[in-house]
Design a protein with these regions (language model features):
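Conserved AAA+ ATPase "SRH/arginine-finger" region at the nucleotide-binding site
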Residues: 137-148
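Extended, compositionally biased accessory segments flanking or bridging domains
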Residues: 1-81
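Conserved small/polar residues in nucleotide/adenosyl-binding loops
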Residues: 163-170
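Conserved AAA+ ATPase "sensor/coupling" helix adjacent to the nucleotide-binding pocket
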Residues: 150-161
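Conserved P-loop NTPase "ATPase switch" module shared by AAA+ and STAND
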Residues: 70-100
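Short acidic, S/G/P-rich loop/turn micro-motifs used as interaction or catalytic elements
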Residues: 26-28, 53-55, 91-98, 125-127
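Sensor-1/coupling segment of RecA-like P-loop NTPase cores
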Residues: 107-129
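Conserved catalytic/switch belt of AAA+ P-loop NTPases
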Residues: 92-115
Length: 170
């Protein structure tokens, strides 16, 4: 995973504006991006999905639920010096909408001039060839041995706690 994280961080540092990450592991992806944000001193990681809207920005939480165009326009308006990564989940459902395609084209050039990145996440690759040259597509690899070992240790530890803690009757 270290090599993947380094490559991802290089994409962020080089101001790659649009990155599509193919994965079914949304929470794991968020954690990996969060760790990269800490390393790169990016203080604002914002996520969006069509049910919950924006998460991670004070006074913005819940905005743009079921409005993918609204959230794309939101990142377009973020001009502050505070670097922002916007993680948009399940975007494949909206990708073929002409207004979404147009906005992604605009964001491709606009985000290069800011310290912001748009990360699109889905287990399905984009279907339109129209935007192929504008979006960098990468796959989140399966967990490596060290990640799996850490997960097994965590499960074992929690299981031990569960079975060794005193029962409420004691």
């Amino acid at each position: 995973m270290d090599s993947w994280s380094k490559n991802f961080e290089l994409l962020i540092k080089s101001r790659t504006p649009l990155i599509w990450i193919r994965t079914k592991e949304e929470e794991r992806l968020y954690k990996v991006i969060y760790q990269s944000c800490k390393k790169l001193n990016i203080r604002r990681l914002v996520s969006w999905d069509c049910v919950n809207g924006i998460k991670g920005v004070l006074n913005e939480n819940g905005k743009f639920s079921n409005n993918p165009l609204g959230v794309l326009n939101w990142i377009k308006e973020q001009r502050s010096e505070l670097p922002t990564i916007l993680l948009v989940r399940d975007f494949h459902k909206f990708y073929d909408d002409p207004s979404i395609s147009r906005t992604l084209k605009e964001l491709s050039s606009l985000l290069r001039e800011t310290k912001n990145n748009l990360i699109l996440s889905s287990h399905i690759l984009p279907s339109s060839e129209e935007l192929d040259d504008l979006i960098t597509i990468i796959n989140l690899p399966l967990p490596d041995v060290s990640e799996l070992t850490a997960l097994i240790k965590k499960i074992a530890f929690n299981t031990c706690l569960l079975y060794t803690s005193p029962s409420p009757r004691d």
